[in-house]
Amino acid sequence: MNANKQRQYNQLAHELRELQTNLQETTKQLDIMSKQCNENLVGQLGKVHGSWLIGSYIYYMEQMLGKTQ
């Protein structure tokens, strides 16, 4: 193999190692983002369900039993 071809392969190998490192870091960051989104989403869903429960209780009390607060 000539020197020029060897230099090109060495450069390609270096760039592939750098790409692998960047992909690993990107994967770590995506995992962190996914965990944060899931935690926030679960919290938001809990708030929405709680609001629905309270709203339906108030509606029931006002409409079905004739009570107002």
Swiss-Prot record:
Protein's cellular compartments: Nucleus; Cytoplasm, Cytoskeleton, Spindle; Chromosome, Centromere, Kinetochore
Leader peptide range in chain numbering: none
Keywords tagged on the record: Cell cycle, Cell division, Centromere, Chromosome, Chromosome partition, Coiled coil, Cytoplasm, Cytoskeleton, Kinetochore, Microtubule, Mitosis, Nucleus
Subcellular location, principal: nucleus
Phenotype of the disrupted gene, per the record: Degron-mediated knockdown disrupts oligomerization of the DASH complex and leads to defective sister kinetochore biorientation and mitotic arrest with large buds.
GO cellular component, one term: microtubule
Recorded coiled-coil stretches: 1-39
One GO term (biological process): positive regulation of microtubule polymerization
Record-linked Pfam families: DASH_Hsk3
Subunit relationships: Component of the DASH complex consisting of ASK1, DAD1, DAD2, DAD3, DAD4, DAM1, DUO1, HSK3, SPC19 and SPC34, with a stoichiometry of one copy of each subunit per complex. Multiple DASH complexes oligomerize to form a ring that encircles spindle microtubules and organizes the rod-like NDC80 complexes of the outer kinetochore. DASH complex oligomerization strengthens microtubule attachments. On cytoplasmic microtubules, DASH complexes appear to form patches instead of rings.
Family per record: Belongs to the DASH complex HSK3 family.
Role of this protein: Component of the DASH complex that connects microtubules with kinetochores and couples microtubule depolymerisation to chromosome movement; it is involved in retrieving kinetochores to the spindle poles before their re-orientation on the spindle in early mitosis and allows microtubule depolymerization to pull chromosomes apart and resist detachment during anaphase.
Protein name: DASH complex subunit HSK3
Origin species: Saccharomyces cerevisiae (strain ATCC 204508 / S288c) (Baker's yeast)
Organism lineage: Eukaryota, Fungi, Dikarya, Ascomycota, Saccharomycotina
